[in-house]
Amino acid sequence: MTDKLIIFDTTLRDGEQSPGASMTKEEKIRIAKHLERMKVDVIEAGFAASSNGDFDAIHTIAGLVKDSTICSLARANDKDIQRAADALKPASSARIHTFIATSPLHMEKKLRMTPDQVFEQARLAVRFARKFTDNVEFSPEDGSRSDLDFLCRVLEAVIAEGATTINIADTVGYGVPELYGNLVKTLRERIPNSDKAIFSVHCHNDLGMAVANSLAGVKIGGARQVECTINGLGERAGNTSLEEIVMAVKTRKDYFGLDVGIDTTQIVPTSKLVSQITGFVVQPNKAVVGANAFAHASGIHQDGVLKARDTYEIMRAEDVGWTANKIVLGKLSGRNAFKQRLQELGVSLDSEAELNAAFMRFKDLADRKAEIFDEDIIAIVSEESALAQEQEHVKFVSLSQHSETGEQPQAKVVFAVEGSEVTGEARGNGPVDATFNAIEGEVGSGSELLLYSVNAITTGTQAQGEVTVRLSKNGRIVNGVGTDPDIVAASAKAYIAALNKLHSKDDKLNPQRA
């Protein structure tokens, strides 16, 4: 039994199923690079058969990421598995993850198949997948609600066909720790060839127990892989949180006795990137990555921490990537200093052109904001990377606004559409509403605003505002992000970024439908 816990990240596949979290190929690539930097063992990059956009994203990530195994999901049929294999061809290390439901409810109501048919399809799917790779994972969907005898029969058969990882899915978050942990243990004990595969856990958070169930699967059940997502992102109530699993196992190594190969200093930067791209704000009291995770308000706690940090801190903020809000650069800083700070932050840009564009944005910000923090730099680079990789159908130029107490604000927005400059003017119930009306008056996208969210990147009244806008059109949902010290300007940039995604072809995305 290995003493290492394999971390399988499915942010780009299962996490993307959160309503509104659909990502472009370029956004998936940026997250995949961060996951590789974090030393994630397996990255499930998508579901190749679901769309051309997802296929392309997996194929590109497979060619770019060399230090993590790249995985594609596939239903238990030849067409899906072939598609996954084709997408994974460039990978230096590839895994096909195939699945079929095994619970009576799913077999009868969803698949309309008999248990014998499901058994045969599972067996043949793994056999076919082994033609392309010796790294094959099998998941019995809704495994935690499956008949135990049937589940043992299916899993024994797929291991015999060559499945090297068996993933016990608590698909609807129905499990509780003791029962789920004992389920994994029982399967490993009853299946004669269970020693030929690594057992994995995949839990959802519908009852708020995804992390607890996963850890029980590890400690009680003997699982040696956990499937999880950054920030616990996922449909409904979310998935198992990667950061919580990793830090629980590292902090309580005395109990779990396992090693994880994750570079934990990359956890917070990756959390922030995923939050920015998806528009899902991390709650302040979220374990490990929440803004208050290492804050102490109680006088007794503060006194204890000042005397000895380990009185009230079981892990160090810097170990998971939190940095103090320190002033790092100013308007007199040069390009080399900017580039060096990017390297210190572990941030890379794909080209000199991107670096130059990011530096010009930094200089512009430094002229408007006296103090520049690491968080400002990361926001600049993140937005610049997104702009460089997205085709700008609409491009923000300038904004002016006027408001008086008791009167509707008025906004004037200048922007370019396919290179031709246009000006939109409108009133609204507030400056942001007026700005969006001004843009829509000229563009006429016919989209619906689903979400408007503002986040201060740093502290103080000079802080940059980071705005997320979520738009929907014909059931398609996209996010746009904009940053600026002027909240209304940031709002305009975010709205335009979302419009550009709506304008891009469907096959650039894994199209998410409302």
Swiss-Prot record:
GO molecular function, one term: acetyl-CoA C-acetyltransferase activity
Keyword tags: Amino-acid biosynthesis, Branched-chain amino acid biosynthesis, Cytoplasm, Leucine biosynthesis, Manganese, Metal-binding, Transferase
PANTHER family listed in its UniProt record: 2-ISOPROPYLMALATE SYNTHASE 1, CHLOROPLASTIC-RELATED, HOMOCITRATE SYNTHASE-RELATED
Record protein name field: 2-isopropylmalate synthase
HAMAP family: LeuA_type1
Quaternary structure annotation from Swiss-Prot or TrEMBL: Homodimer.
Domain of life: Bacteria
SMART domains: LeuA_dimer
Matches recorded under PROSITE patterns: AIPM_HOMOCIT_SYNTH_1 (PS00815), AIPM_HOMOCIT_SYNTH_2 (PS00816), PYR_CT (PS50991)
Entry binding sites for Mn(2+): 14, 202, 204, 239
Family: Belongs to the alpha-IPM synthase/homocitrate synthase family. LeuA type 1 subfamily.
